[in-house]
Amino acid sequence: MRRLVLPLLASLLVLSPLARAEVVDNLYQVREPVTSQQPDERNAALKRALQVLAGRLTGNPQAGQTPGLASALAAPESLISQYSYDAGPPEVLVANFDPAATERALGQAGLSVWGANRPVVMIWWLNDADSGATLVGDGQPASTGVQRGAQRAGLPIRLPLADLNEQLAGTAANIDASDPTALRQASERYGANALLAVHAKPQGNGWQAQWRLWNGSAADQGSSQAADQEALATAVLQDVAARLSKKFVSRPGTTQPLTLVADNSNFERYAQLQKVLEPLSSRLVKVEGTQLTYNLTANPDQLQAQLGLAGLQPASAPAATAAPATPAAATPGAPVDATATPSAPVAQPAPSAQPARTTLYFRWP
């Protein structure tokens, strides 16, 4: 690998625009509320933390209930590199899980892992109470619950600054609309991949929200309920993560051996692509000019979605190389030497047991 990377450093070290997807910070860290630091409470919190992490790493909020994960849940401390307490309020146990051990446990349970490189979600969140409607802006007190919910769900997010122009855009009419044009225009400066509009209201002793999600040309919607605003944000964003993961996570039995050829690369793009391909058992096998060639195992459609986050676009395969000429057949009627000793048949090599690889071509613009 070093022989491949060294020429890559020399040939690709030029600047390029940053891709929009982001690596999720503290992906393997879970902050779980506790009522004390007693051993029984700690053990219960570690189990809950593993269940939260299983949902975050797979995009499936119910992954922590998978029967194959039972042995790991019985001894979650075996997957933890360290833990500590944060006095809060509220007091929480901060558990840092070992990535390799955790992914191995999930794999043994038959669960596929969503990599740390994930789409950025632009959130327009409107809290509508008796005192009036308030757009949640970045840095405002109400944004804390949304940020915590995003961390629990494993999503990188953006919130509007909520300046005057954005207040005019983030109205109930625009947030409830099925047409996202107004919100998309107001979101352009944030460079996000997906757009989420949430309208939250008090309901009984709790809160409920209606939300709409746009990811490229795909649209989705749903509703969530919770006891308070922070719990509501967690519920909404875990549901959104579950919807997004269907596009990016390869489920068991849907993958195949692939060869990926990525052209027009540079060093920065190479580094970004390495992060995208890390969960896919990828191996860099060739570097030629600005072209990178990888062998990997993935679902082709979900690989394309992941590559799109890194700015790669499908490309045409190069013109096929001309096939070698076949020996000319004997001319009809030509004399045959009947005294010649027939040549022994040449043994053919056994067919390779390696599965055929489909080659996919992509390039950066």
Roles of regions detected by a PLM:
Residues 1-8:
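Bacterial N-terminal signal peptides that target proteins for export
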Residues 65-80, 156-195, 299-303, 328, ...:
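Short, solvent-exposed, polar/charged sequence segments at loop or secondary-structure edges
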Residues 62-125, 135-141, 147:
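Signal peptide-directed extracytoplasmic domains
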Residues 46-68, 123-176, 273-297, 308-311:
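N-terminal segment of the mature soluble domain
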Residues 16-18:
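N-terminal signal peptide c-region/cleavage motif recognized by signal peptidases
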Residues 28-31, 35, 187-231, 304, ...:
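Amphipathic beta-strand/beta-sheet edge segments enriched in Tyr/Trp
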Residues 28-57:
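N-terminal targeting signals for Sec/Tat export/insertion, comprising classic cleavable signal peptides
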Residues 248, 256-365:
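C-terminal soluble interaction/assembly domains
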